[in-house]
Amino acid sequence: MVTNRSHLSHHLPVIVLCISIFILLLIVIILSLLPPIATDALVHHLAIPKLWLLNGGFYEIKWSVFSYYPMNVDLLYLIPLYFHNDIIPNFIHMGFGIGTSWLIFRYLSNKLNRVAGLLGVLVFFSTPIVLRMSTVAYVDLGLVFFTTASILAYLHWRNEEYKKNKWLVLSAIAMGLALGTKYNALIAWLFLTLAIIFFYSRDTEKQWPAIKYGAIFFLVSL
């Protein structure tokens, strides 16, 4: 009996966190089943791909400034819209939020423990703006996912003492996808490029290689 109680108390934080995350996810799924009513979804993220489908291909929509914005995530909405489904885009956008949660969980679990990983997921997913964004066909969670992936890939490269350059390339590719999702990624792109140069130079005391790797990240991201 004592052993069972000890076992339960040991796993209680994990159980509570998992239940909390499940409840939040269930609420988001239910809300995502509603038809799109968000303004940006109706005039931009779903409207532009729908116009492309009606035209039979890409074309310049001069009357809509939104058509000149980055469209990486919006292009994914073409598939369900082709089948006249405007609900699936909500779940596609939600998927980026879940993907970001997974990245947070993996990072914190490896750095600390599973409880910290689940707590990180709960804090992220319970943030009001994340909950709201998870129920609409926007692109912001795609931006968050790609930016987070880029930063974590860079940290992995740095933790490996800059020996596995594939992580730098993966970081640059992820940042490039973020840039193709929303212009806000330009800020993260600039700061991460400078961070690569600064920390590599400080950690290795080599300036020219630092500039070289910063340039590689900068150019591959484009």
Where are these regions (language model features)?
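Start-transfer (signal-anchor) and selected internal transmembrane alpha helices
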Residues: 1-28, 212-218
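Extracytoplasmic catalytic/substrate-binding loops of multi-pass membrane glycan-assembly enzymes
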Residues: 34-48, 54-76, 83-88
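Transmembrane alpha-helices of multi-pass, membrane-embedded glycan-processing enzymes
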Residues: 73, 77-84, 89-103, 143-146
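Transmembrane-helix signature of polytopic, membrane-embedded enzymes
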Residues: 87-88, 102-126, 145, 162-163
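Membrane-interface alpha helices of multi-pass inner-membrane proteins
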Residues: 120-121, 154, 167-183
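Short acidic/glycine- and proline-prone juxtamembrane loop motifs at membrane-interface regions
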Residues: 132-142
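Membrane-interface transmembrane helices that cradle and orient dolichyl/undecaprenyl
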Residues: 150-167, 202
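Perimembrane helix-loop-helix junctions
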Residues: 188-221
